[in-house]
Amino acid sequence: MSSALYESSITSLPLLGRGKVRENYAVGDDKLLMVTTDRLSAFDVILGQPIPDKGRVLAQMSDFWFRKLRHIVPTHETGIAPEAVVQPGEADQVRGRAIVVKRLKPILVEAVVRGYLAGSGWKDYQATGKVCGVQLAPGLRNAEKLPEPIFTPAAKADVGEHDENISFDEVERRIGPELAAQIRDVSIRLYKEASDFAATRGIIIADTKFEFGLDENGTLTLMDEALTADSSRFWPADSYQVGTNPPSFDKQFVRDWLEAVRIDGQPWPKTAPAPQLPADIIEKTADKYREALTRLTGETLR
C-alpha cells in the first residue's frame, strides 16, 4: 500500500478550508486547488484513520466521470496541472489526488438522485411510504429498483453536522423555481446516463449525489466530485437481489461495521469521536475503492 495522506500541508497557497475529505487552497482570485485526502467520513463523522489510496481513487473516478458527462453540464475543471501551482517540495501531496478548478459560487443544496430503495431511503419508506417526501407505491422491498429515478435533495450542512433532507418545494424557496428545476433535471439526466454506462460494466448505481455552483456568468456548473464511491452507492450486478442489502463498492462496508460495533456494550452513537477501525477493515475498504475504480472505468490507479 502507498502512504496515506490524512491532511495536506501546502504552505505556498492560502488555505481556504478543510471539508470532511477535501481541502481547498486559493490559486489567485478565480481558481482553487482542491486536494482529496484519504480521510473517510461516515454518518457525517470524520474517522481518525486514513484509507490508503482512497483520495487518489476518488480523484481519478471524478476525472473519468467529468470527462464522460461534460456534454450534459459544464464542470469545474480547468485543465491546469496541480503540480504547476505548488512548490516542488509539495508536489507529492497533490500528484494524482488534486485538481485545479474554477472558483464558483456554491449552491448549498446536495442534489441526491435515487434509482433504488436503499439505506436511509429504505428506512424512510418503511416508516412513511415516502422517501424525503416523495410518495412511492406501496409494497416495495429493500433494494428494489424504482420505476423512475427520484430527486431527493438535502441541505448541505457544516462539517460535523448532518445533512438535512428537504422537499423540492423548500429547494424552490431557497434558490428559486427555475434553478431548482434545472438542478433536478440535470441531476436525473447525469444519473441516468452514468447508470446506463455502469450497467455495461456490471455495476448498479443505486443512488448518488451531485453538487453544483454558478460561474461568473451564472451558468450552472458541476463541482466537487462526480459519481465516486464516496458520493454513490455502487452494487455488483451479479450478486444483486431484491429484499437484501447488496454488497457494495463504497464506504457502506465501514458503515456496516460501525453499525455493529459495541462500545462498553452500547452501539456507537454516531457522534465524534469515531471508534478506531481495525486494520483489516481499513485494508478491505481500500481494496473496495480500488476495485470500484477498475470495475467501473476499466482503469487502474494511476
Curated annotation (Swiss-Prot):
Gene3D superfamilies cross-referenced by the UniProt entry: ATP-grasp fold, B domain, Phosphorylase Kinase, domain 1
GO biological process, one term: 'de novo' IMP biosynthetic process
Entries under InterPro entries matching the protein: SAICAR_synt/ADE2_N (IPR028923), SAICAR_synth (IPR001636), SAICAR_synthetase_CS (IPR018236)
Pathway recorded for this protein: Purine metabolism; IMP biosynthesis via de novo pathway; 5-amino-1-(5-phospho-D-ribosyl)imidazole-4-carboxamide from 5-amino-1-(5-phospho-D-ribosyl)imidazole-4-carboxylate: step 1/2
DNA-binding among keywords: no
EC number of this enzyme: 6.3.2.6
Pfam family, one: SAICAR_synt
GO cellular component terms listed in the entry, alphabetical order: cytoplasm
Top-level EC class as recorded in UniProt: ligase
Keyword Nucleotide-binding: yes
This protein's UniProt keywords: ATP-binding, Ligase, Nucleotide-binding, Purine biosynthesis
GO molecular function: ATP binding; phosphoribosylaminoimidazolesuccinocarboxamide synthase activity
Catalyzed reactions per annotation: 5-amino-1-(5-phospho-D-ribosyl)imidazole-4-carboxylate + L-aspartate + ATP = (2S)-2-[5-amino-1-(5-phospho-beta-D-ribosyl)imidazole-4-carboxamido]succinate + ADP + phosphate + 2 H(+)
Assigned protein family: Belongs to the SAICAR synthetase family.
Protein name per its UniProtKB record: Phosphoribosylaminoimidazole-succinocarboxamide synthase
